[in-house]
Each structure stands twice: as structure tokens, then as C-alpha cells.
Amino acid sequence: MNKLQFIAIIAALLFISCENNDDLVLDNQLELNYSYSPIPLGDINAKFSEDISYGPEARNTFDIFLPDSDQPTPLVIYIHGGGFISGNKEIVYEPMWNGSWDFPEEIKTLLNAKIAFATINYRLLEFKDDPDGVLKSLNDSKRALQFIKNNSKALNIYKNNIILTGSSAGAGTSLWLGFSDDMADLSNKDKVLRESTRVKAVAVKATQATYDLEKFQSLIFAEYNFKWMDYFELDPAMYHRFKSFYGMSSLNEFYTEDITNYRRKVDMLSMMTEDDPEFWVANLQKPVVAPTQNTIVTHHAYHAKTLKTWADSIGIANVAYYGDYEHPTGESFVDFILRKAME
């Protein structure tokens, strides 16, 4: 067989394969367009790329800082807060207004240590009558993680050394991803969704312990005799957000089989197993008082306390700060990330 015949046969076989196999997905190299950094980097050697699309929706985008390196680098992914109804990835380009988080300085510290940094957007919930509920937002963040892993070579990152971070809703999302079993769908036609969702570590601030909101009553705030129906009288707007959180049209659906199953899918507390990654958590911004305001309900010290209690009982390493409790090591957010990235 001469060379031309061999090439013709191979080409024909590939053509037939493409016609008969819808699963065939060709690898397209991610093309990055670099722009000016939104924060002054000084003499740090790093590039910045913004609004990279990771999915079909308008808010399926992320920005990334990439340190110059001749080897793949660790990566920190930041997921913004906002109660799943507001917020955006650009929040990290200025220090937090209350002084609790100096994002730009921390980003520069990471870049100096040859650690890349990404910040993502995701779809938000409608304030009233969202048909999909919070899984819409959570699954967007999942896809962002998988997309980045799928393009790890183009981004020069080490896909098995990714640390998730976030505040408020982004904190809870990070924990949901960290404590979920691997959500790789190996038979999916979409190559992105075949990627593992396992991460090296999670570091969060002002988090929620679970998105099964029933456990706010029965577990987290049990000592306060907290009841959602009583809370709705204090904060009527929360009534609509509560329904949208699970895609409910009525609160009467809350204990139905469908919504009970939905709540189970977002209960990261119950997802904890001993093989889950080490985490760092700090809920220090709100007073340790009865949860009678929205920001206290969602950012209370007892969320971090509950996470630590469950993790300790299972055997998951953790560094926690809440109320008057401080981890014996005093390890900071950045120091935790540096330690885990270098392990």
C-alpha cells in the first residue's frame, strides 16, 4: 500500500467515524486575549485576561490572572457573594468596604507565589418565582471549575491543585463543590462536564453551613427556637426569596418529595465525608445573637461552628474562626492557601 492510499483510507475512516459518532469532540485550544490588569501589579510578572466564556449564558464568564511560569501553577478560584440575587466577579478589584477583605493585596501575594487567580460570574436567581432555584447558580460554578480544568494546559495551571474561595453565597458554593462527591459525567458529550470537580482545598468567609434551609431551624439555630414562618413576619421580602431558592411556587411545596430531594442535593453539610478537602472558614463579622436579620441569619457564627463540629466528628481537617473561637494556629486566609497550594 502506498502512502497516498494509506492517507486516503485513514481520512475515510475518520469521516465515517465523525458521521456515526456524535460523541466525537475535537479539542479547541482556548485563545486568551490579554488586557490591562484592573489592579496595579507593580513589578509582578503576570498577565490578565477578562470575560472568558465558560458556557452558553451571558453570565458564564470569568477573569484570570496568570503568573509568568515555565511550569503549571496552582490556581485559586474566587466565587462572589450577593445572596444569589446580586454581585459580580469584579468585586475583588477593590478592598471590601468594611475592611474585612483586601482582595487586591491578597491577589498580589498569590501571584508573587506563582499562584494563578480566577474570579467567576454565574447566573443569578430571580427575586420572585425563579423556576430553577439555586442549583442553577451552583451548577454554573461547577461548570466554570470544569471548564478551567479542561483548559488547564492553555492556562498553564495544575488542574489537581485548585483551591476554591468565596464570601457569603460564593462561600457556600465553594463548600458545596468541595464536599460534593465527584460530579464528573464521564459519558457526557460535553467534554467540559467530563472533568473532575474535586479540589485541593476550600477557604471561605461569611458562609452558610448548608443550603437545606430546614436545618437552619432544626440544627444551626435550634437553641434560638428559630422558625422561618416567624422570621418572614420580621422580613417579608425573604418569603419570596425563600420560594425562589428551590424554584417553588408556594411554601406548601417545601416538604413535598420533590423539594425534599432538591434540598438534599444542596445540603453540603450532609455531603461531608472523610475524604473531602481541608477547609478554612471565618464567620466573624456578625454578633453572636438571635438571628432576627437577614445578614445575621446567613452569616451567623453558628454556621462556621456547625461546619467545624461536623468536620471534627468525621475527621476532615479544618481551620475555623467564629464568635470568640480562634483556631490554635492562628493561620490566616492567605497563609492557609499558600500552605495548601505548596503541599
Please report, for each region that a protein language model flagged, where it lies by residue.
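Serine-hydrolase catalytic core
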Residues: Y211-S218, F226-D324
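Short beta-strand element of the alpha/beta-hydrolase
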Residues: P72-G87
